[in-house]
């Protein structure tokens, strides 16, 4: 189900990340060539991460960010096995619980009455994993990621990919590619795009909410 982010939707709803609910798979019209520069970003597919997979961009981004920041995430699977669909299902489902989105004993149940997640949910999960989460303005997040920090960005997925979709989404940025574009790992396009470079201006145009710097 897609929840349109028009003027009739509350500001709090507009600040939420929904994931990939209802968005068709595509490589993205405005994505540049695959990243060439070194980065600690990893690829994790939010699809196949349990009953809430289509809206798990938030918890998946939290796992990506923690791993990129060098933090230990329990049950994280690295390499090709981990980047495959469902490869990190357990790690993401446990992050849902750490974020307060589902109970530990039953990942099929929700403990919230909304679709997706808020940055504040992700920050709680990151801190529960002994990481540091610093809530920041979007432009500050872009600047920090350009200097090598790991940053979760709240973007409008349709504007990011150049597609006809209207909902918020979380991605993780860190570093730059050989062309000076910011490297972004998109959990909603793990198989089609993975880690890709976007210009800062394009990311600014895709802004939906704030950012969180993770260390």
Regions found by a protein language model. Give the residues of each.
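Conserved active-site-adjacent core of cysteine acyl-enzyme catalytic domains
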Residues: 83-215
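Active-site-adjacent structural segments surrounding the nucleophilic cysteine of cysteine proteases
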Residues: 2-112, 157, 164, 178, ...
């Amino acid at each position: 189900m897609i929840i349109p982010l028009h003027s009739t939707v509350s500001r709090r709803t507009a600040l939420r990340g929904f994931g990939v609910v209802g968005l068709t798979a595509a490589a993205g019209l405005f994505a540049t060539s695959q990243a060439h520069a070194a980065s600690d970003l990893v690829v994790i597919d939010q699809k196949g991460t349990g009953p809430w997979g289509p809206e798990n961009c938030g918890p998946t981004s939290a796992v990506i960010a923690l791993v990129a920041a060098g933090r230990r995430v329990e049950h994280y699977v690295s390499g090709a096995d981990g980047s495959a669909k469902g490869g990190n299902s357990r790690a993401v489902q446990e992050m849902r619980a750490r974020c307060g989105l589902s109970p530990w004993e039953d990942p099929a149940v929700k403990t919230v009455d909304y679709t997706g997640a808020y940055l504040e949910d992700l920050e709680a999960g990151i801190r529960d994993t002994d990481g540091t989460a610093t809530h920041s303005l979007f432009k500050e997040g872009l600047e920090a990621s350009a200097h090598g920090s790991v940053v979760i960005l709240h973007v409008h997925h349709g504007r990011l990919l150049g597609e006809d979709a209207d909902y918020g989404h979380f991605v993780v940025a860190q570093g730059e590619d050989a062309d000076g574009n910011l490297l972004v790992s998109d959990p909603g396009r793990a198989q089609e795009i993975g880690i890709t470079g976007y210009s800062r201006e394009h990311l600014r145009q895709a802004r939906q909410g704030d950012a969180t710097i993770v260390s």
